[in-house]
């Protein structure tokens, strides 16, 4: 049995890709996408029909050019997501414009719009996770969306403070970014050794996992942004792991032993009092890595969104 099959005994595996060919190859339940992946996919000739269909939809809806462009962008995500859902049994994670990350009301509005678009494709909201950057405002939006049976995937999660407010809000799922945490510490020459137990990204997820299970939080932990197979295997037993096609392929090629690394504690503790916004801001602000990587991630996804807008605008 290869490592991927062994890993699936302990952890739900998710494909981190927007490419239908890669997704179909691995036959897994769930898929995650983001603006970077969608921009890459939309640059391929075989997916140009999605852009043209989205523009036709936007023109039919009418309004100003800005409104049409916004509708076309969202429709691209929804058409691609709908195509992916035809080939999987689980959920698709679709991200809203990261430039809305500091406005709770706009996050809610855009999330509802995406869900409405999916429902136009006869996709039930239970099969869609709305991806939001894990800011205070976005977590607040996720808490409100939950009341309307719209579940969220809080992404760009780097700090323990972010993990705490997500758990306290009862969000459906979080995506701590293992590789990007590792990158920051490596760039600062702050990693003690090459041993996986000294990997700060791996240890961040281990800490969150232990805390969530110890205090009985139901939010799903999905490790993301892996740089190598060792990081993946070090988190075997995590609720979910979203993995790129390249690393999934490497796992398939190996028959080495896979040992479960994350095991929930037997005894539960009473949950602490929820943090206030000011407490969260200070707690998060104390983590220089998290502050830098969250800001960088939001900017990068915003840049990818802008580039996708340019592609669509040139086809109007």
Swiss-Prot record:
HAMAP family, alphabetized: Transaldolase_1 (MF_00492)
Sorted UniProt keywords: Cytoplasm, Pentose shunt, Schiff base, Transferase
Protein name: Transaldolase
NCBIfam families, alphabetized: PRK12346.1, talAB
Pathway(s) served: Carbohydrate degradation; pentose phosphate pathway; D-glyceraldehyde 3-phosphate and beta-D-fructose 6-phosphate from D-ribose 5-phosphate and D-xylulose 5-phosphate (non-oxidative stage): step 2/3
GO molecular function, one term: transaldolase activity
Intracellular or extracellular location(s): Cytoplasm
PANTHER family hit by this protein: TRANSALDOLASE (PTHR10683), TRANSALDOLASE A (PTHR10683:SF16)
């Amino acid at each position: 049995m290869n490592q991927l099959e062994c890993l699936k005994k302990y952890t739900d595996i998710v494909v981190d890709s927007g490419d239908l060919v890669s997704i179909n190859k691995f036959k897994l339940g769930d898929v995650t996408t983001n603006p970077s992946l969608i921009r890459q996919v939309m640059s391929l000739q075989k997916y140009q029909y999605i852009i043209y269909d989205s523009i036709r939809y936007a023109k039919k809806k009418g309004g100003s050019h800005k409104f049409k462009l916004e509708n076309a962008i969202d429709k691209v995500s929804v058409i691609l997501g709908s195509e992916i859902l035809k080939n999987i049994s689980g959920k698709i994670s679709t991200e809203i414009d990261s430039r809305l990350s500091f406005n709770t009301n706009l996050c809610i509005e855009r999330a509802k719009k995406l869900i409405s678009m999916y429902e136009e494709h006869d996709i039930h909201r239970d099969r869609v996770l709305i991806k939001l950057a894990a800011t205070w405002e976005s977590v607040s939006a996720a808490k409100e969306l939950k009341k309307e049976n719209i579940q969220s995937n809080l992404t760009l999660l780097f700090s323990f403070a972010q993990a705490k407010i997500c758990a306290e809000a009862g969000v459906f799922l979080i995506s701590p970014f293992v590789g990007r945490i590792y990158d920051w510490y490596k760039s600062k020459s702050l990693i003690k050794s090459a041993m996986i137990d000294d990997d700060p990204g791996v240890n961040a997820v281990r800490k969150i996992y232990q805390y969530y299970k110890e205090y009985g939080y139901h939010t799903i932990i999905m490790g993301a942004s892996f740089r190598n197979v060792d990081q993946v295997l070090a988190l075997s037993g995590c609720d979910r792991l979203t993995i790129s096609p390249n690393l999934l392929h490497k796992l398939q090629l190996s028959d080495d032993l896979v040992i479960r690394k994350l095991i929930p504690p037997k005894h539960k503790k009473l949950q602490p009092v929820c943090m206030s916004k000011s407490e969260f801001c200070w707690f998060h602000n104390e983590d220089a890595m998290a502050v830098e990587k969250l800001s960088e991630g939001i900017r990068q996804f915003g840049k990818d969104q802008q580039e996708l807008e340019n592609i669509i605008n040139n086809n109007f």
